[in-house]
């Protein structure tokens, strides 16, 4: 090659470089149980042409790093708060909904208990009314039984009286007077009941007979006065 030395670019130099290139080490598929060696930290070495960093610049770079870390921490905290905020709101809403459901259930149970209490009070009032009706019916039955017992006692006394005086009562109407004849029979027997002077005969009383122009003359006898 132009511009190069023969010793550097010749075949001898190429053979040297070929000899310097060694084959790569064989790859071990099994991992070693020992931990890997720590990676060495590279510290920038100042070159002879560069001057060493000043302490003010180092403090400024450290403050900038701290500011960046603080900003990252604030961003992470705000993200966590933003993630936890909706969850907390949903939890509060769920708690409020659960309380509302519990209150509605308690109100429904209270209404059911109140309805049952009213029903029980109505049933008790009806039972009391029926009890009063039954008492009134029992009193009526007692009065009727008493009246029936009195009637039965009267009937028994009447039967005893009839049994004791039945023969006399049967003989009594035969010995008594005959009944008053009716008006037609009286008129057929002489019209004694139609004339005013004949009414006294049909009367039961013993009052004086009325005056009659056709009065019969008394029978003549030794005691009767002569005309």
Swiss-Prot record:
Q: Where is the composition biased (Pro residues)?
A: 22-55
Top-level taxon in the UniProt lineage: Eukaryota
Which portions of the sequence form the region Disordered? 1-72, 200-227
> Alphabetically, which GO biological process terms does the record hold?
cerebellar cortex morphogenesis; neural precursor cell proliferation; regulation of cell cycle; regulation of cell population proliferation
Q: Which UniProt keywords apply?
A: Cell cycle, Developmental protein, DNA-binding, Neurogenesis, Nucleus, Transcription, Transcription regulation, Ubl conjugation
The Gene Ontology terms for molecular function here are: DNA binding
Q: What does this protein do?
A: DNA-binding factor that regulates the expression of a subset of genes and plays a key role in tangential, radial, and lateral expansion of the brain neocortex. Regulates neural stem cells proliferation and the production of intermediate neural progenitors and basal radial glial cells affecting the process of cerebral cortex gyrification. May control the proliferation rate of cells by regulating their progression through key cell-cycle transition points.
Quote the subunit structure annotation.
Answer: Interacts with TMF1; may regulate TRNP1 proteasomal degradation.
Official protein name in the record: TMF-regulated nuclear protein 1
Instruction: Name the source organism.
Output: Homo sapiens (Human)
